[in-house]
Amino acid sequence: MTVQTAPQIVKNYIGGEWVESISTKMEAVYNPATGEVIAQVPLSTKVDVEQAVSAANEAFKSWSKTAVPKRARILFKYQQLLVDNWEELAKLITIENGKSYNEAYGEVLRGIECVEFAAGAPTLMMGKQLPDIATGIESGMYRYPIGVIGGITPFNFPMMVPCWMFPLAIACGNTFVLKPSERTPLLAARLAELAEEAGLPKGVLNIVNGAHDVVNGLLEHKLVKAISFVGSQPVAEYVYKKGTENLKRVQALAGAKNHSIVLNDANLELATKQIISAAFGSAGERCMAASVVTVEEEIADQLVGRLVEEANKIVIGNGLDEDVFLGPVIRDNHKERTIGYIDSGVEQGATLVRDGREDTAVKGAGYFVGPTIFDHVTKEMKIWQDEIFAPVLSIVRVKSLDEAIEIANESRFANGACIYTDSGASVRQFRETIESGMLGVNVGVPAPMAFFPFSGWKDSFYGDLHANGTDGVEFYTRKKMLTSRWEK
C-alpha cells in the first residue's frame, strides 16, 4: 500500500524557534518543473510580524554590543556550513525555483561569496580619524548598527538575494526580519537552520512567510529602521514610497530591460555564446538577463542565424536532469503571461524567428516556455518596453553605435548594458554615454561581485545606497563623530 504524505507546512522562524503562523491561510508551493505541490506556506499576518520584530529588537540589545571579530567568526563558520551543504542547497533551489542544477550550484557560490564579504566586518566597520583638525583638537568617525532591518526577497534567487542582505546587516551589528518569496520559502528556512548551527544567537535572524500583509507590516512598524527589497518595478516603487513615508531607509531594487549592443567588429562566436546564456539562463527570470540585442545592420543576419541555431540546441526540462539548460518559469500564470507577450510581439509586427510556444506542450505538467527570439523589433512594441522576465529575446537593427545607445537610453529601466566590440574607442563612448548602472564589455551578465555595489539606475532602483559593497555597509550603519580637545 502506498502511503500518501501531505506536503510540509512551512513555519516562521521567530526568536530562534520554529513557530506556526497566526494565520490559517495557506498558499501552495509548487515544483515548477512538475506542477507538484511540495509545501504549504502560511500567509502570515501583522501579528506575526510584530512577534518577529519584537524578537529582533530584543536581540539587538546584546548583538549590537557583541565584539565585531566575534560576529565575524560566526559568519566564517556559517560560510563553511554553506560550503559543506552546497549540493543540498543547489538541489533545493532547483526543486522550488526550477532553474537548472548547474545554475543553482552557481547561485550557491554567489551566496557564499556574499557571506565571505560580510565576514570582513572588522575592516568594513572601521571608522576614520584626523588627529589635528585644529591645535590640540582631533576628530574621529565611528560606525554603529541602526537596529532592526527588514528584508523582502524575490523567487528568482532564493539564496543569493537573502545572502546579499542579512549576512552584511548582521555583520554590522543589526538584527534582521526576512520575508522570502512565498513561492520559494524552503531555501530561506534552510539558511536559517544553518545560521543557527553556526552559532547565531536567537532573534538575530527571523523569518516571516507571507505576502502583502507581511510587507506592509514591515513597512509600517516603527521599530524597523530600514528596508532592503528586490523585486518587480511596481512593488519596488510601492515599497520605496511607503517605507520612506514611514521615515525608514529604503533600498529597492526593481525591474530591468537590459540591452546588449553588437558592433560590426565583434567576435560573433563569443557574442552568440554570451547572449544565449544571458538571455535564456534561469529561464530569463533575472534582473540582469539580456532582453534586447541591438545589432548593426551589416552583421544582423549572421547574428540572428547564429542565435537561432544555438537556441535550437538548448535542452529544456527538469533542472535536476543532467543535460538540461533551460528549466520552467516559476508558475503557470507566468507561463501564460509570457505567451501573451509572444502573441503581442507577433501582433505588433515583429518577426518571430524562434517560437518558444512550441516547447510548452511537450514537457508534461511543468510550466515550460522555450527560448523565443524576435527580429525587427522596434521601441514602440510591448516586448521592447516591458520587463517580460522570461526566455524572450528581442533584436533591434541599427545603423550605428550612436543609434544603439540612443535607443537603449530611451528605456525607463537601466540595470545593465553590454557591448560586444574590439574597439577601445567604442567601449569608451559606450561607457560614457549609456544610461545604465552595470556595464559589460564582451560579457553577457555584468553583475558585480559582492564587494561592489549592485548599481541599477532609473526605474531599476529606488534609493540612495545600493546593495552590496561599501554602499551596503553605509546602508546598514550610522555614524558618530567625536571631536576632542586634549591639552597639557
UniProtKB/Swiss-Prot annotation:
Enzymatic reactions: 3-oxopropanoate + NAD(+) + CoA + H2O = hydrogencarbonate + acetyl-CoA + NADH + H(+); 2-methyl-3-oxopropanoate + NAD(+) + CoA + H2O = propanoyl-CoA + hydrogencarbonate + NADH + H(+)
Gene3D superfamilies referenced in this protein's UniProt entry, alphabetically: Aldehyde Dehydrogenase, Chain A, domain 1 (3.40.605.10), Aldehyde Dehydrogenase, Chain A, domain 2 (3.40.309.10)
Annotated NAD(+) binding sites: 155, 179, 182-183, 232, 387
Recorded metabolic or biological pathway in which this protein acts: Polyol metabolism; myo-inositol degradation into acetyl-CoA; acetyl-CoA from myo-inositol: step 7/7
CDD domains per UniProt: ALDH_F6_MMSDH
Active site per database record: 287 (nucleophile)
Lineage top rank: taxon: Bacteria
GO function terms (MF aspect): malonate-semialdehyde dehydrogenase (acetylating) activity; methylmalonate-semialdehyde dehydrogenase (acylating, NAD) activity
Any matching Pfam family: Aldedh
Enzyme class: oxidoreductase
Keywords (A to Z) from UniProt: NAD, Oxidoreductase
Enzyme Commission number(s) of this protein: 1.2.1.27
Coiled coil stretches, renumbered: none
One GO BP: inositol catabolic process
Tagged with keyword Oxidoreductase: yes
Function noted in UniProt: Catalyzes the oxidation of malonate semialdehyde (MSA) and methylmalonate semialdehyde (MMSA) into acetyl-CoA and propanoyl-CoA, respectively. Is involved in a myo-inositol catabolic pathway. Bicarbonate, and not CO2, is the end-product of the enzymatic reaction.
Quaternary structure note: Homotetramer.
Family affiliation: Belongs to the aldehyde dehydrogenase family. IolA subfamily.
Matching HAMAP family: IolA
Entry protein name: Malonate-semialdehyde dehydrogenase 2
Organism phylogeny: Bacteria, Bacillati, Bacillota, Bacilli, Bacillales
Gene this chain is encoded by: iolA2
